[in-house]
Amino acid sequence: MAKKITGYIKLQVPAGKANPSPPIGPALGQRGVNIMDFCKAFNAQTGDFEVGTPLPTIITVYADRSFSFVTKTPPATYLIKKAINLKSGSKEPGKASAGKIKRSQLAQIAEVKMKDLNANDIESATRIIEGSARAMGLEVVEG
Protein backbone atom coordinates (compact mmCIF):
# COMPACT_ATOMS: atom_id res chain seq x y z
CA MET A 1 0.00 0.00 0.00
CA ALA A 2 1.24 3.49 -0.85
CA LYS A 3 2.14 5.96 1.88
CA LYS A 4 -0.43 8.61 2.74
CA ILE A 5 0.67 12.06 1.58
CA THR A 6 0.14 14.86 4.11
CA GLY A 7 1.39 17.72 1.96
CA TYR A 8 3.74 19.27 -0.55
CA ILE A 9 6.34 21.95 0.04
CA LYS A 10 7.67 24.02 -2.86
CA LEU A 11 11.01 25.72 -2.30
CA GLN A 12 13.78 27.21 -4.40
CA VAL A 13 16.98 25.88 -2.87
CA PRO A 14 20.56 26.67 -4.00
CA ALA A 15 22.31 23.51 -5.22
CA GLY A 16 24.68 22.05 -2.64
CA LYS A 17 23.78 24.72 -0.07
CA ALA A 18 20.77 23.26 1.72
CA ASN A 19 21.01 23.99 5.45
CA PRO A 20 18.53 24.15 8.35
CA SER A 21 18.31 27.95 8.33
CA PRO A 22 15.29 29.78 6.83
CA PRO A 23 13.51 29.20 4.51
CA ILE A 24 14.21 25.43 4.56
CA GLY A 25 14.18 24.80 8.32
CA PRO A 26 10.85 26.42 9.20
CA ALA A 27 9.07 25.01 6.12
CA LEU A 28 10.13 21.44 6.90
CA GLY A 29 9.85 21.80 10.68
CA GLN A 30 6.16 22.72 10.46
CA ARG A 31 5.50 19.38 8.77
CA GLY A 32 7.63 17.39 11.21
CA VAL A 33 10.25 16.38 8.64
CA ASN A 34 13.82 15.69 9.80
CA ILE A 35 15.56 18.78 8.42
CA MET A 36 19.12 17.41 8.47
CA ASP A 37 18.09 14.27 6.56
CA PHE A 38 16.62 16.47 3.83
CA CYS A 39 19.68 18.74 3.71
CA LYS A 40 22.09 15.79 3.41
CA ALA A 41 19.98 14.06 0.73
CA PHE A 42 19.47 17.29 -1.25
CA ASN A 43 23.14 18.26 -1.18
CA ALA A 44 24.14 14.74 -2.26
CA GLN A 45 21.64 14.70 -5.14
CA THR A 46 22.57 18.18 -6.41
CA GLY A 47 26.32 17.61 -6.37
CA ASP A 48 26.53 17.65 -10.18
CA PHE A 49 25.07 21.18 -10.40
CA GLU A 50 27.20 24.29 -9.94
CA VAL A 51 27.08 25.21 -6.24
CA GLY A 52 24.58 28.00 -5.61
CA THR A 53 22.41 27.35 -8.69
CA PRO A 54 18.79 27.90 -7.59
CA LEU A 55 16.75 24.73 -8.05
CA PRO A 56 12.97 24.65 -7.69
CA THR A 57 12.26 21.68 -5.43
CA ILE A 58 8.98 19.94 -4.61
CA ILE A 59 9.09 18.02 -1.34
CA THR A 60 6.37 15.43 -0.73
CA VAL A 61 5.71 14.84 2.98
CA TYR A 62 4.12 11.56 4.07
CA ALA A 63 2.02 10.71 7.15
CA ASP A 64 4.92 8.86 8.82
CA ARG A 65 6.99 12.10 8.55
CA SER A 66 9.18 10.67 5.81
CA PHE A 67 9.66 12.62 2.59
CA SER A 68 10.69 12.44 -1.03
CA PHE A 69 11.69 15.31 -3.27
CA VAL A 70 12.00 16.20 -6.93
CA THR A 71 14.31 18.91 -8.23
CA LYS A 72 13.44 20.80 -11.39
CA THR A 73 15.79 22.57 -13.79
CA PRO A 74 17.05 26.04 -12.80
CA PRO A 75 14.74 28.98 -13.65
CA ALA A 76 14.97 30.29 -17.23
CA THR A 77 15.84 33.78 -16.01
CA TYR A 78 18.82 32.41 -14.06
CA LEU A 79 20.08 30.50 -17.12
CA ILE A 80 19.61 33.54 -19.38
CA LYS A 81 21.50 35.84 -16.99
CA LYS A 82 24.27 33.27 -16.65
CA ALA A 83 24.55 32.82 -20.45
CA ILE A 84 25.28 36.51 -21.08
CA ASN A 85 26.85 37.43 -17.70
CA LEU A 86 24.03 39.79 -16.74
CA LYS A 87 23.39 40.96 -13.17
CA SER A 88 19.72 41.87 -13.65
CA GLY A 89 17.21 42.48 -16.41
CA SER A 90 16.01 45.87 -17.65
CA LYS A 91 14.09 48.12 -15.27
CA GLU A 92 11.84 49.06 -18.22
CA PRO A 93 11.47 46.04 -20.55
CA GLY A 94 10.36 47.12 -24.02
CA LYS A 95 11.82 50.61 -23.59
CA ALA A 96 15.36 50.17 -22.31
CA SER A 97 17.44 47.20 -23.45
CA ALA A 98 19.49 45.30 -20.87
CA GLY A 99 21.60 43.57 -23.51
CA LYS A 100 21.52 41.14 -26.41
CA ILE A 101 21.24 37.36 -26.53
CA LYS A 102 21.73 35.08 -29.53
CA ARG A 103 19.00 32.72 -30.64
CA SER A 104 21.53 29.84 -30.47
CA GLN A 105 22.06 30.57 -26.76
CA LEU A 106 18.29 30.49 -26.25
CA ALA A 107 18.14 27.11 -28.00
CA GLN A 108 20.80 25.72 -25.62
CA ILE A 109 18.81 26.98 -22.62
CA ALA A 110 15.63 25.47 -24.11
CA GLU A 111 17.37 22.07 -24.35
CA VAL A 112 18.24 22.23 -20.65
CA LYS A 113 14.70 23.34 -19.68
CA MET A 114 12.89 21.01 -22.12
CA LYS A 115 11.70 18.46 -19.54
CA ASP A 116 10.07 21.18 -17.40
CA LEU A 117 8.49 23.15 -20.25
CA ASN A 118 5.07 22.55 -21.75
CA ALA A 119 6.47 22.19 -25.27
CA ASN A 120 6.45 19.37 -27.81
CA ASP A 121 9.60 20.27 -29.73
CA ILE A 122 12.76 22.33 -29.33
CA GLU A 123 11.48 25.18 -31.55
CA SER A 124 8.47 25.86 -29.35
CA ALA A 125 10.63 25.54 -26.23
CA THR A 126 13.03 28.10 -27.71
CA ARG A 127 10.12 30.49 -28.30
CA ILE A 128 9.07 30.13 -24.65
CA ILE A 129 12.60 30.97 -23.47
CA GLU A 130 12.73 33.83 -26.01
CA GLY A 131 9.61 35.30 -24.39
CA SER A 132 11.31 35.16 -20.99
CA ALA A 133 14.36 36.94 -22.42
CA ARG A 134 12.20 39.68 -23.96
CA ALA A 135 10.34 40.09 -20.66
CA MET A 136 13.73 40.72 -19.04
CA GLY A 137 14.37 43.51 -21.55
CA LEU A 138 16.84 41.61 -23.71
CA GLU A 139 17.11 41.96 -27.47
CA VAL A 140 17.10 38.63 -29.33
CA VAL A 141 19.52 38.54 -32.27
CA GLU A 142 20.21 35.86 -34.89
CA GLY A 143 23.25 33.71 -34.45
Swiss-Prot record:
InterPro entries: Ribosomal_uL11 (IPR000911), Ribosomal_uL11_bac-typ (IPR006519), Ribosomal_uL11_C (IPR020783), Ribosomal_uL11_C_sf (IPR036769), Ribosomal_uL11_N (IPR020784), Ribosomal_uL11_N_sf (IPR036796)
One example of a Gene Ontology biological process annotation: translation
Keyword Oxidoreductase found: no
Family in the record: Belongs to the universal ribosomal protein uL11 family.
Lineage: Bacteria, Pseudomonadati, Pseudomonadota, Alphaproteobacteria, Sphingomonadales
Gene: rplK
Name used for this protein in its record: Large ribosomal subunit protein uL11
An annotated GO cellular component: cytosolic large ribosomal subunit
Keywords on record: Methylation, Ribonucleoprotein, Ribosomal protein, RNA-binding, rRNA-binding
PTM annotation: One or more lysine residues are methylated.
Pfam families on file: Ribosomal_L11, Ribosomal_L11_N
Assembly and binders: Part of the ribosomal stalk of the 50S ribosomal subunit. Interacts with L10 and the large rRNA to form the base of the stalk. L10 forms an elongated spine to which L12 dimers bind in a sequential fashion forming a multimeric L10(L12)X complex.
Cited function: Forms part of the ribosomal stalk which helps the ribosome interact with GTP-bound translation factors.
Gene Ontology molecular function, alphabetical: large ribosomal subunit rRNA binding; structural constituent of ribosome
